[in-house]
From Swiss-Prot:
Keyword Manganese on entry: no
Function: Mediates post-translational transport of precursor polypeptides across endoplasmic reticulum (ER). Proposed to act as a targeting receptor for small presecretory proteins containing short and apolar signal peptides. Targets and properly positions newly synthesized presecretory proteins into the SEC61 channel-forming translocon complex, triggering channel opening for polypeptide translocation to the ER lumen.
A cellular component annotation (GO) from this entry: endoplasmic reticulum membrane
Name the record gives this protein: Translocation protein SEC62
Record flagged with keyword ATP-binding: no
Gene designation: SEC62
Tissues expressing the protein: Pancreas.
Source organism of the structure: Canis lupus familiaris (Dog)
Membrane topology: Multi-pass membrane protein
Length: 39
């Protein structure tokens, strides 16, 4: 039982990190597009 809860919390934490990472990548791509568009 305890292990299952730990696993659930860990998977939730990983999901949140992946979501944040995904958003950061998208932001970087948008930034790159904006900068290349200026030139």
């Amino acid at each position: 039982m305890g292990h299952r809860v730990d696993y659930f919390i860990a998977s939730k934490a990983v999901d949140x990190l992946l979501m944040k990472y995904d958003k950061d990548i998208k932001k970087e791509k948008e930034k790159g597009k904006a900068e290349s568009g200026k030139e």
